[in-house]
Amino acid sequence: MKYYESVADIFCQHGIDRCFALLGDANMHWAGAMHERGVKFVYTRHEHAAVAGAAAYARALGKIGCASVTCGPGLTQIMTILPIAVRANIPMIIFAGEAPIGRTWYNQMIDQAPFVKACGAEYHALHDLNTLGDQINNAFTKAHHNKMPIVLGMPFDLQKMPHTDTPKLAACKIIVETAKNIDLTPDIIETAAQQIAEAKRPVILAGLGAVAAQAKPACVALAEQSGAMLATTLPAKGLFHDQPYNLGVAGGYATQKSKAVFAQSDLVIGVGARLASHSFDGGQLTPNAKVIHLDLSPQATVQGRHAADLLIPADAKYGAEALTAAVKKQTGWRTPEML
């Protein structure tokens, strides 16, 4: 067995069943092995399109995307889409290959890592065959948990080397974060509940994290309990389309009527949302509101802007349910006039 076959095995064991690719010297043997193992390939005319396709696939299906480009000039073509995927927190593995490590000259040889790192992604050079399986497993685990693209570069002469040490080259199971892994501190929930109780015009802003966690019922229940209006970030548009107190999309794409309502809010509860500048219209959308950020990775500062006053590190669904249980029933501004 060749190493490129074992690498393909690990990818398949991690659930990769589709790959977006443009082939060349450094990735064609691996791609052939992936195809033989039943992986469906979507071939593109440009490397940018391959990575963009994998990013869209990852976002649509909620799984790790897979793309592949050849080394050197194949890799440099993804420098536009790669930072986009980084900033969108898209989990993705990009198999790029590398120039042969056993040659002193190769016409497509460049130092690939600085290009990738400059985009904010990580570059893992697969040069140590003794730890190859661990390196690939670590990349999949990090892409999943940190929601980020990782580029794997493996010299194609190493890919074609034979080996017999199959046990070392097996996939490790990725531990998926669930509510059982989350320790909701009672003090934080109590503080948040107090802020919600004091609010007269709260708004719940749900993002893709709420969609992924299937937290819509929990968000609706929290809104009904706290008297809050409902809204979403642009990527989560339509989540509350069937709810009567729905403001629609927040930010620059909000309707004028919704913007007028947002401007009066005194508390925003971000649930599974990034609290990006666009979602708050650069801070102009809710100028007088405090912000609670409920997310697996909550942040006080986002894109150089103060974004939240209270951070709740929790799964969107179970965090919203915990808040609902802690909040006393109140009308807020859920009145007939607001329909």
Model-predicted segments: where are they?
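Short glycine/serine/threonine-rich phosphate/pyrophosphate-binding segments
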Residues: N27-H29, A49-G53, P73-L82, V86, ...
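Anionic-ligand anchoring segments at beta-strand to alpha-helix junctions in alpha/beta enzyme folds, i.e.
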Residues: D17-A55, A60, S68, L184-T185, ...
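Conserved thiamine diphosphate
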Residues: Q108-N146, Q264, D309, G319, ...
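Short internal beta-strands
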Residues: A21-L23, I94-A96, G153, A228-L234, ...
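Phosphate/pyrophosphate-binding active-site segments
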Residues: K2-Y3, N130, G153-M154, T166, ...
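A short helix->loop->beta-strand "cap" motif at the edges of active sites that frequently abuts
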Residues: V39, I90, G227-A228, T286-K290, ...
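Phosphate/diphosphate-binding loops
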Residues: G251-V302
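Conformationally flexible catalytic loops at phosphate/diphosphate-handling active centers
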Residues: N138, K142-E198
